[in-house]
């Protein structure tokens, strides 16, 4: 009886171990942590320009003036742990200064924002090992669409949600709404990662693999956010060493950790398809 259970356990764990071994090999071969470091560096250079462009778009549409404040609070409360208020203050100051830029300066902000999107595109296609490239005009159109329509769609979604919550019948669903609001950051991360893994690679990605990889990345992101916030508040070594400028290394570490999670989700998505392909080739061999 015990031997039978052990055999069944071995039968089920062997494919998992083989897949984990394949995942580890791909992470090593793709230099995932180095890619994450490159993206973290570009992200810090592009962070203020990207936010400046996004909120400039909101300013161009008066109906989104109140929604932009809600989105700003939501982003810093749910996606930047522990020091979100401090970072938000600095970034809002930088954005206010950028509003006084000339046309040439504004063009530079847009180019820097597009540079981040190009770096993400390049890193993900490196992981997928895709040699096919999109036409430059098409890539620029996609990046520009994400940069302009993405924030507006998010604003419209939040505006509709706020309107529905203000309706009288919604008061009877307070408990359900509270639970949904707690899950909303996870659902939003899951959807964003799924779109990232499905659309950005220039090769075909199976939808199921992208959903699984995105779910793992979203769960790790939420867990990592709480763990990072706990570490910063429990072991305030950065504040003791760096003092007032401690927010800079804290932000860099968090951005680097975030990109490690994003790229790990991409590696999981790729490995699921590669492992399935290897198993198919094994069964077809005589």
UniProtKB/Swiss-Prot annotation:
This protein's UniProt keywords: Cell inner membrane, Cell membrane, Membrane, Transmembrane, Transmembrane helix
Pfam families noted in UniProt: Virul_fac_BrkB (PF03631)
Transmembrane segments: 44-64, 74-94, 104-124, 140-160, 183-203, 210-230, 244-264
A GO CC term assigned to this protein in UniProt: plasma membrane
InterPro entries linked to this entry: UPF0761_bac, Virul_fac_BrkB
Superkingdom field: Bacteria
Location(s), subcellular: Cell inner membrane
Membrane topology: Multi-pass membrane protein
Family: Belongs to the UPF0761 family.
Name of the protein described by the UniProt record: UPF0761 membrane protein KPK_5501
Higher taxonomy: Bacteria, Pseudomonadati, Pseudomonadota, Gammaproteobacteria, Enterobacterales
């Amino acid at each position: 009886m015990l031997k039978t259970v052990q055999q069944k356990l071995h039968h089920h764990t062997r494919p998992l171990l083989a897949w984990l071994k394949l995942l580890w090999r791909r992470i090593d071969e793709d230099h995932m942590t180095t890619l994450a470091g490159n993206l973290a560096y570009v992200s810090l250079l592009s962070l203020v320009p990207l936010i400046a462009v996004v909120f400039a778009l909101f300013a161009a549409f008066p109906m989104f003036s109140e929604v932009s404040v809600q989105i700003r609070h939501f982003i810093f409360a749910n996606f930047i742990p522990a020091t979100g208020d401090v970072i938000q203050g600095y970034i809002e100051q930088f954005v206010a200064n950028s509003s006084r830029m000339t046309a040439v300066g504004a063009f530079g902000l847009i180019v820097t924002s597009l540079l981040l999107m190009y770096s993400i595109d390049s890193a993900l296609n490196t992981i997928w090992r895709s040699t096919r490239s999109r036409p430059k005009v098409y890539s620029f159109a996609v990046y520009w669409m994400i940069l302009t329509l993405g924030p507006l769609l998010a604003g419209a979604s939040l505006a509709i949600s706020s309107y529905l919550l203000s309706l009288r019948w919604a008061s009877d669903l307070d408990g359900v709404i509270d639970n949904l609001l707690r899950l909303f950051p996870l659902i939003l991360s899951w959807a964003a990662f799924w779109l990232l893994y499905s659309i950005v690679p220039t090769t075909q990605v199976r939808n199921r693999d992208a959903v699984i990889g995105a779910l793992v990345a979203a769960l790790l992101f939420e867990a990592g956010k709480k763990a990072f916030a706990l570490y910063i508040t429990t072991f305030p070594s950065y504040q003791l060493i760096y003092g007032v400028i401690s927010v800079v290394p804290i932000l860099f570490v968090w951005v680097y950790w975030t990109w490690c999670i994003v790229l790990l989700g991409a590696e999981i998505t790729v490995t699921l398809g590669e492992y399935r392909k290897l198993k198919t080739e094994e069964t077809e061999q005589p």
